[in-house]
Amino acid sequence: KIMELLIFVSKITNRIFYIFELILKDELGINFKFTTDKDKFLSHEGPKLHYGDHPLENNEGLYQQSVNLLFERDITDPNVKICKHNDSKAIFPVFNEKSLFCFDIFSASFYIISRYEEYLPHVCDHYNRFQPQDSILYKMDMIEKPIINIWAKELGEIIKSKYPDIQLKKKSFKFIPTYDIDAAWSYRNKGFFRTTAAFFRDILKLDKKEIKRRFDVLTNKKMDPFDTFDYQIELQKELKIKPLYFILCGDYNTNDKNISIKNKEFQELIKHLGDYALVGIHPSFSSYLKKDVIKEEIKRLSEVLNREITISRQHFLRLCLPTSYQILSELDITDDYTMGYASQAGFRAGYADTFPFFDLENDTKTKLNIHPFALMDGTMKDYLDLDVHESFDKAKKLIDEVKNVNGTFILLWHNETLSGEKRWEGWITLYRKILDYALK
């Protein structure tokens, strides 16, 4: 018989059900059931845990003191306090010495993973994005740690030491490379007007090198520098990795400079990538919060590939909770890969694994799966201003963190980074080193 953990709570809310399921079942593999019957709980012989604001007399089982957060439905500002925990930090301190942890591990995890703080008033950056420095993890200096996985592991060890018969899940580390295709080519397939305009721009700038480079590519003397797709497929075969691709299919504008989806060569490329990998939509900058625009972009990609599109990642990582996720769900997207920051490496939701999106506005667990990424090429280059050596150290540190908790490490890269040209000099070798390190 599989051991079950009986959990006593004064009431079962959607928030409670969601976070206990995530930590106990998904992360630790522990089966459990809830009861609100105190006597049933006290007389229960097997493994048991009480979660509530004060301990019960005669409880032989485990006790975790609670704060109010999970018993509520409304989105109020809980005025989060940071406290010490072992050699690091936590939030939502509790003070009863019988409590398993000196903080409410379930409320703390829920607050972070639900992105509660992103529903509260905050100042966005110039692309309408929530800023990492406003997050509690940043203030705790824990943004580069998969903190929920770490806490869950500690909880698992405590439960196991009290109830040795409980089986914990054996998780294994996974590595998923992903590519955002914002512009498949640097010079080719840009159409007559864009190409002519670019030539005139180079002439005005007297940029002889660039004029020659463009001319050589357009006359097929040289490969287009952004055309690194053969190399990606080679890596895929050699290292037996399964990447994901997100394709920008929006209308051309300042922030969406993709190749037109009507272009035949672009369509061929998309089909070619689709033969080797799972391909998803990269909703454009200008589709932000516009359901009909995203719907049209999904339709364009779906028609090229002749299959349903179920995975997505926002261009510029523009994400507004819960609206962005509500829209994607309504458009039959099942899995989103946007969760992460542009300006900061690490774990936006404190978790290095897939989790279901909990919609705080409607107080429900949804069917949309969130896949957080830990590292993006542009973050290191443009925001943190790291060279290739520092970038490798950053990647190594994050991969080690995820390996430590047997989580999933998702890497976000772009085809142009693998050109190894101009600003991306040395980045092909860096990419290969990161892959080798993750896979060893």
Describe these PLM feature segments.
Residues I233, L239-I309:
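Acidic, glycine-rich loop-and-beta core segments that form the ion-binding/anion-interacting portion
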Residues Q232, E268-L269, S324, L398:
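Residues within well-ordered alpha-helices
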Residues K1-I261, D353, L360, T364-K440:
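Terminal accessory/targeting
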Residues I16, S286-K365, K422-W424:
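Catalytic domains of cell-wall/extracellular-matrix polysaccharide-remodeling enzymes
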Residues T178, G280, R313:
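Generic enzyme active-site microenvironment
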Residues K237, L273-G274, S329, K403:
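Anion (oxyanion) recognition and catalysis
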Residues G280-H282, T338-Y341, L412-E416:
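Short acidic/histidine-rich active-site segments
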Residues D180, H282, L328:
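Conserved hydrophobic/aromatic pocket- or pore-lining residues that grip, position, or stack substrates
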